[in-house]
């Protein structure tokens, strides 16, 4: 990853953390939403990122079946835990975080 992209990513997460801290009292319920290509083990990889957290996970395939929407409702202890989770799943090929 080039330096400019790394800087933009870091700035994005800093802004997200500030916004989450402004709008929540911790711990708080947080709804993660992802779109992943419906190939290999993408959905399972997202689900496993939230193992043992008491998450409620809902998946919906697109009309064509090429993509799957994954919604994860889970109690998070603070904004940094949310950001860490986004970073953890960002390595899944083709994932889009909403």
Residue locations for each model-derived region?
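Long, contiguous binding/interaction regions
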Residues: 1-69, 75-98
């Amino acid at each position: 990853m080039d330096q400019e992209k790394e800087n933009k990513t870091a700035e994005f997460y800093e802004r997200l953390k500030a916004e989450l801290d402004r709008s929540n009292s911790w711990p708080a319920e947080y709804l993660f939403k992802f779109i992943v290509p419906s190939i290999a083990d993408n959905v399972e990889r997202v689900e496993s990122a939230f193992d043992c957290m008491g998450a409620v996970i809902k998946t919906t395939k697109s009309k064509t079946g090429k993509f799957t929407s994954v919604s994860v409702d889970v109690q998070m202890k603070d904004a940094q835990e949310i950001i860490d989770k986004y970073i953890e799943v960002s390595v899944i090929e083709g994932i889009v975080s909403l």
